[in-house]
Design a protein with these regions (language model features):
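N-terminal organellar transit peptides
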Residues: 1-88, 92-198
């Protein structure tokens, strides 16, 4: 039997500051060294990523996605609830991705809290961050850069916001996720990929 490492990405992806104790979080500073160890050991042959996240910090979420994408071992992700916001790059960062029929993905423009300086440079900075996300997602899935940007700036779905919610099959049709499936499908796919790599 193959030895699989299980990684859960849940709640909110924590940034460079601790969130409140009542918030369920994924701490990137724990996961990055964990993934480095997984890459460096012969005992682990594949990684299964379970995702149910509302999103969170952009730079930390992208760091996790880049780390997953750069692993040499087979990786499979399974969206079992939500994969919102920066959860989208995480879901597509693996070699193959699944979403359960009721799972959702929310694609929306970059948001920032706190005090902002109202200059063109601030807008350009937002555009740069957004481009990093669009480039990563389109580079690791079947959706084009332009189509993803269109989904991100959709004004017809959310009453007080921009963006698109994709449920299950819609995420597959748009090319974000590879296939509809559950834990059995995800594990079987990972075992098959490991077997082909041996």
């Amino acid at each position: 039997k193959s030895k699989i490492h299980l990684l859960s990405i849940i709640g909110e992806i924590e940034g460079h500051e601790n969130l409140s104790g009542s918030t369920k979080t994924t701490k990137y500073e724990h996961i990055l060294p964990e993934l480095a160890k997984v890459e460096d050991t012969d005992e682990i042959e594949g990684i299964l990523v379970l995702i149910n996240t509302v999103g969170g910090d952009v730079s930390c979420g992208l760091a996790l996605a880049e780390m997953l994408a750069s692993l040499s071992k087979p990786t499979v992700s399974l969206v079992i609830g939500d994969s919102h916001s920066i959860g989208v790059p995480l879901a597509v960062s693996t070699d193959y991705s699944f979403i359960v029929p009721s799972g959702t993905m929310l694609v929306h423009p970059v948001r920032m809290s706190g005090m902002l300086i109202g200059t063109s440079k601030t807008y350009e900075y937002f555009e740069m961050i957004q481009d990093r996300i669009l480039s990563f997602v389109s580079g690791h899935s079947r959706v084009s850069y332009d189509r993803l940007k269109e989904l991100m700036h959709n004004t017809k779905m959310l009453s007080k916001d921009l963006g698109t919610v994709l449920v299950g099959e819609n995420a597959v049709e748009e090319g974000l996720i590879d296939e509809i499936g559950g834990i059995q499908d995800a594990l079987q796919k990972l075992y098959d990929m490991i077997e082909r790599k041996r």
